[in-house]
Amino acid sequence: MERAFHALVDGGRVWLVDPLDGPEMEDAAALGEPAGVLQLLDRHNRDCATIAARLGVPHLKVPDAVPGSPFEAIAAVRLPRWRETALWWPARKALVVAEVLAANPMHTGGRERVGMHLFLRPWPPQSLRGYRPEHLLLGHGHSVHGPEAGSGVETAYARARRDLPWVLKGLPGSVRG
């Protein structure tokens, strides 16, 4: 599954979202003064703690708020085994989502630009509905920009239940069992 991380820059400060340690980290850290590492999904440990310690910045795991930042934290999912926060950046009209929405075949079934996570399709969480981003930054798959970003969110919700059989059919054999 294609994984992505994001470096969000505002006022010379950089917030690293669900980062992966690799060559890209040097480029991300060079964008400005590191302000924090944000882990938006409880199980997206990735390299968050290591990177935060190395940079000497806070590691905020599934935060309810991001103090000193331009982001609004959204409680995307709050279930016993799934805690996820999304970020809304009003000034940039950017929505950052770790797992609820993604742009990879496991989420989309190959039919949608953006799709809902398989396990959430029967009862989609309503927390992200209504946001009309111009930039949709995702934890899996390529980000979506422009009018497709907002319509991608709405389409993912509108087709969540209806396309569930199609998504299940498209899962790789190793996942189906």
Regions found by a protein language model. Name each.
Residues 1-3, 71, 82-84:
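Short beta-strand-initiation
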Residues 13-16, 79-177:
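Metallo-beta-lactamase
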Residues 68-77:
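Short Pro/Gly-enriched beta-strand edge/turn motifs at strand-loop
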Residues 1-36:
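Pre-active-site segment of Zn-dependent metallo-hydrolases
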Residues 11, 34, 54, 131-132:
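Structured helix-beta-strand junction loops
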Residues 22-68:
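Active-site metal-binding motif and surrounding structural segment of the metallo-beta-lactamase
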Residues 2, 23-25, 43-47, 66-67, ...:
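Active-site environment of divalent metal-dependent phosphoester hydrolases
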Residues 9, 51-53, 79:
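A generic structural signal for short, solvent-exposed coil/turn residues
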